[in-house]
Amino acid sequence: RTLVRWQSFFPAGRVEADDGVARAARISARTEVGAVLARDSAEIPVTQLFLTGGATTVRGYSYRSIGARTQNNQLYGGRYMGVASVEWQRPITYRGNMTDWENTLFVDAGAVADRAGDLDPRVGVGTGVRWRSPVGPLQADLAWGVQSKQLRLHLRLGFTF
């Protein structure tokens, strides 16, 4: 099983409050690809196969709801996975003062399949807020699953690794 993750942040301007305090806006780009490289006849433990979806991968879909499908449309873990996300993060000012809040706009996409050529991405788009709380970062995202045609609220406390 091979899994590769990459994330980077790119400057996207600055937001300045009336008192001169400024913070950078940024674009966050993230991708994750994985593959189980074994003979087709090999029995792979289900814990080594891939599922994706949820607050940390493809928002707009429930946790681990994106996977390979049987002929009867049953979900199961697949041998190949790809996930990508682009998010614009912008500090929020209120009455001319910088706050501990940020707003975001994002697009996520992810796919899982048993053959790399069968990867069919599921896309989620949405908006959210981030709060640098005393106990750690709090994230609330409202996302639309394009293929599922469902709106989902995702809440998280803590850092993304």
Identify the function of each model-found stretch:
Residues 118-130:
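A short alpha/beta connector and helix-capping loop motif
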Residues 143-148:
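A short, acidic, flexible beta-alpha connecting loop/helix-capping segment that sits on the rim
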Residues 127-133, 150-161:
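Outer-membrane beta-barrel "beta-signal"
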Residues 56, 135-137:
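Coil-to-beta-strand transition motifs
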Residues 1-106, 113-115, 153-159:
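C-terminal outer-membrane beta-barrel translocator/porin domains of Gram-negative envelope proteins
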Residues 69-71, 124, 140:
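Short structured motifs
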Residues 26, 137-139:
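Membrane-spanning beta-strand positions in outer-membrane beta-barrel proteins
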